[in-house]
Amino acid sequence: MAAPGLPQPGSLSTLAGYPSSTYSSQNSPFFPSADRGGRMTLEEIKRDFTKHKLECPDTMWREPQPEQVQGLYSFAIESIFGLTVNDVRIEEVTGDVRSCLPSIDSLQFLSQDGRLHAKAIGNLRFIRLCQRLNRVLGLPEFSRETFASPTASGVQRFASAVCMLLRLRESLCRQFESQIQQRASLQQSLQKLSQNAQLVEQELLRFRAERQTQQPLAQRQKQQQSELEEELRQRHSELGALMEEFKERQAVHGRLELELGDLVLELMNLKQEREELHDQVVHSPEKLMERRDELRVQQKHLDAQLQELENLAASQQKLLLAFAKAVKKAKKAMEILSAHRDQVLAPHLGFRSDMRTREKLFRELGEQKEQLSKAVQDLQAEREELARQLEDQERKKDEEETELRGHLARAKREVEERKKALADQQDMTAAFLREAEKLEEKLAEQKQRHKLLVDAIEEEIQKVYAAFLTYVSQMQFIRSQMPLSLDLSQSASFLAEHSEKTHRGSPLACEREENDDFLASLLAESSPSSLGEEKENLPQSRPTAAADAERRLADFSPEKGRKRLSCLDEETEEEARMHERERESDRLFPAAREPREDGDFPMYGHAE
């Protein structure tokens, strides 16, 4: 599918992930279209393809072939989408079809006959990528006629669109890469500065408002805040430890998946090797049988030769017997001729020549017998050696088969153990997620309850503040109506009687009765230093009492009450959140709160 000399996809291959409307011929002026006629010349296209190390024959531009058009589309898919033949036709490359569903456990789900569909799967994926590529380039909708009956104009238009897109991608990358990086860094820094400025302003306003009125309380809150921040840092460190442990478990999970895949591949390799060994084991006995038959034929041939030699020896023996008879006859003849030889020839010449001839014949017969016996021994030794080799091969075959069966059983046990461990890890992860969701729900409920409590307290503050204003006004009126010669005890009794008379039956009577002690203390503070100077100090004591009342009134204003309640609410909410986290962590990890022998907590690590 892929054309030769394809370049590696760049970092901007992700541009192909944008919708097709962004690169349509009606919305973008950078791509060629039929209504604008914006196309590149053939020479420019060839130069661009040469720059990308793609060689196209000249016949493709005049009479394109389906294979050439497919190669051009493959080059465009790899350059724009960053997908190679290993990504598009992975089934044909690996030779098997695998499922991406976790329920099938990433194993083969097609039989040997079903593997014929691997090519069809790759073709369907390739056609969908071609359709997506046409939409990205702003070309007409892709159809199978593009490959079945390609035209020169269509091929040139497609090549022009691809070159224009590659040029546009390179120019945009060179033009805006530094600006985009600079803008992203500036946005991050600006966001951080704005957040820091808001935090500083809020802290400054809060401290200015509380500094004059609540200096001791501010010190205590500051100390408590430092303690809470320290505890928060500890909680953050514990959370970081938990996150690291979660990441480690995820990494272990990923490694287990990879090892499981490796084991599956190793199991497949072992199966294939077992089949090959099984084929060898099946065929080798036939070869041994053939070899044994050949050896039997050879043994029969040697037996026949041995029989022939035995027959020859028997014939030689017969010849020897005949020769002995002949010798006897010759002796008789010699006896007959001896007289003649004695008379004619020397008697010893004939006898000496005869003995030499017989000795030579006896030596030749002995040598032949030794050679035959040696050949018989060699054949027997070769037969025994072949029998031993056959036994060794059978024993090795049995040992190898036993070893392979043991390896296969161990591999199966390891796969089952890893599957069980993976299931346990998944269950633990799901339990952690469920506990985190429960914690979030409880925190939301706690915030809602705190909000309702704050609203109710604010309403009560408004009521108390209104009652206090009414009461202070009545007190000032009564003070103005009191006789000047009364002492403090008489003034207090007169105030109580006058209040009971004037406000009997009022809805706020109960609340005012509860604050009689507070009014008495106000009267005591606002009274003059001596009874003798009562009249002279009366104009001064009344403004002083009024100022005291106003100051106490300011101390109990709704704004300061709200501030106190907000501070108390924040403290209460933070303490409740800390206690809730501690209870949840103790419930989830009971063993983590128990210190080890070295004084360390095993779940959260060393305390800071």
Swiss-Prot record:
Residues 121-125 are annotated as: Required for nuclear localization and function. It is found in: Chromosome, Centromere, Kinetochore. One of its GO terms (biological process) is cell division. One of its GO terms (cellular component) is Ndc80 complex. It comes from the Eukaryota. Keywords: Cell cycle, Cell division, Centromere, Chromosome, Coiled coil, Kinetochore, Mitosis. Residues 176-319, 358-460 form a coiled coil. The keyword Cell division applies. Its main location: nucleus. This is Kinetochore protein NUF2. It comes from Toxoplasma gondii (strain ATCC 50611 / Me49). The lineage of its organism: Eukaryota, Sar, Alveolata, Apicomplexa, Conoidasida.
